[in-house]
């Protein structure tokens, strides 16, 4: 029985493995995303956090290493600021390089099948602008269609998103405003962890 319990415990640990990919192109200059990652590291020390801007400043992705991280994970979190209605260039590059035919999709590409994908992101503009009548012309959810399509192609499970709006660089003009962004970002992390705990 002891061995059976040990196997169950191991299975539980494996099932809870989380990979968090930071797609900010300049994390050192960030407040919101940097705070979110710092809080995640404190609250989920077992999670693997990958900071793409630090690992690959030249955008030369180590495909094999990144694919191995994906293989180990059960839940994949993409953490990023929304740049021009999409992920930053380094995160796009990471996906282009690691989600390769024969690995993530295609007749023999089933390595991501069944893994859960969660989006965690921030925007500079207020949420009210993301509507059909607002300045952006589309809802936030509509901008996420490409990730849902990616999940469909790779047979991953799209497991939802957590986002925080209105945390722009322009709102960091005083120490008080910077601290406010940090507090908002900690609250964002709490919501993200709540979502992860349901998966």
How does the language model describe each region?
Residues 1-13:
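N-terminal amphipathic/basic-hydrophobic helices that include classical n-h-c signal peptides
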Residues 46-58:
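A short beta-strand-loop structural module common to alpha/beta enzyme folds
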Residues 37, 148-199:
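Glycine-rich phosphate/pyrophosphate-binding loop and the adjoining helix
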Residues 31-35, 61, 89-93:
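Generic recognition of short, well-ordered alpha-helical segments
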Residues 64-148:
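Helix-loop-strand module that forms the ligand-binding subsite of alpha/beta enzymes
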Residues 56-64, 173-174:
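Structural motif
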Residues 15-46, 182-183:
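N-terminal beta1-alpha1 ligand-phosphate binding loop
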Residues 22, 51-53, 162-163:
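Residue-level recognition of beta-strand->loop/alpha-helix junctions
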